[in-house]
Amino acid sequence: MIEIDGSFGEGGGQILRTSLTLSVITGKPFRIFNIRANRPNPGLQRQHLWAVKAMKMISNAETKGDEVGSKELIFVPHEIKGNINIDIDVGTAGSVTLIIQTVLPAIINKNVRIRIKGGTDVPKSPTIDYIRLVYLEILRKIGIEAKLNLIKRGHYPEGGGEVIIENVNGNPSAFSLLELGKLTIIKGISHVSSLPAHIAERQMNSARELLSKLGVPIEIQTDVRQGEVSKGSGIALAAIGEKSIIGADSLGERGKRAEIVGEEAARILIDNLNTKASVDIHMSDMLMIFASLYGGEYIGAELTSHAYTNMEIIKKFLDIKIDVSGKRPFRFKAKIF
């Protein structure tokens, strides 16, 4: 059984999520201890348990320690089950997108349909529009297709969002994403939920003003939803090049003007573009597991603590070589084979 110290590296939920994904894919059981030991509320929290539950259902796994506050978990997977429907409610504003990242690599070609309720646009995780505009589009470039249906948005703290992910299929193989290529267009989605529509317009316009200096077409849509459980706003952007995509997002909050939200996302996007990387900071972390499974190389905008932690966990499950050139927290090249 693979032994994992949950306090290693960034010491958060990423260690658990990566371990769950690779355990289900490889069939290797693991024991993780010191879960989130250095966090203010140590141990498993509800949204972590839903990641465990989802992967348990997918693989018919045996578990021990899967309860709120537990600092140790044993996870023994069996064969991945296909042709199933799974309902997950991560509660209030628990991150829907972190659940998607955990389960998606394990359900390729398995005919699994997952309905996830919780927070679609919450702090400390990619927004659902980033997932749609960037994550899924880059996966398409490496041979993976998925259908994502955003039914309701959920913001912190009320949540109430709902997403369905299904038809995850493909024939992924080794990939090389070493440059963005010529920038062709910037796409985006500026949204509001249960707030005035002009907020989405102001976010869009302020982002557009900064991005116009890049000299490429800009297509930002607005998504205005009234009657949602939670109130909130945000914007996600995708700079689409001939070979890859760079993304960024920003969320509104009480007291934060809509213009600041749009400017913030645009500045993050420009900062990522200026690194000359092939993928942004979010994808630098998320792409590593796919490169580890299928072989791949890419240039990430920043070598984050999440990426570094991911590397060490991946090496416990897979007999691969990870060649990384670059120092935290700067641009880096990853080659995994």
Swiss-Prot record:
Catalyzes the conversion of 3'-phosphate to a 2',3'-cyclic phosphodiester at the end of RNA. The mechanism of action of the enzyme occurs in 3 steps: (A) adenylation of the enzyme by ATP; (B) transfer of adenylate to an RNA-N3'P to produce RNA-N3'PP5'A; (C) and attack of the adjacent 2'-hydroxyl on the 3'-phosphorus in the diester linkage to produce the cyclic end product. The biological role of this enzyme is unknown but it is likely to function in some aspects of cellular RNA processing. Its main location: cytoplasm. Its EC number is 6.5.1.4. The gene is rtcA. It is found in: Cytoplasm. Belongs to the RNA 3'-terminal cyclase family. Type 1 subfamily. GO terms for cellular component: cytoplasm. GO terms for molecular function: ATP binding; RNA-3'-phosphate cyclase activity. It catalyses: a 3'-end 3'-phospho-ribonucleotide-RNA + ATP = a 3'-end 2',3'-cyclophospho-ribonucleotide-RNA + AMP + diphosphate. The active site is at residue 306. SUPFAM superfamilies: EPT/RTPC-like (SSF55205). InterPro entries: RNA3'-term_phos_cycl_insert, RNA3'_phos_cyclase_dom, RNA3'_phos_cyclase_dom_sf, RNA3'_term_phos_cyc, RNA3'_term_phos_cyc_type_1, RNA3'_term_phos_cycl-like_CS, RNA3'P_cycl/enolpyr_Trfase_a/b, RPTC_insert. It holds the Pfam family RTC. Keywords: ATP-binding, Cytoplasm, Ligase, Nucleotide-binding. GO terms for biological process: RNA processing. It comes from the Archaea. ATP binds at residues 101, 282-285. It comes from Saccharolobus islandicus (strain M.14.25 / Kamchatka #1). This is RNA 3'-terminal phosphate cyclase.
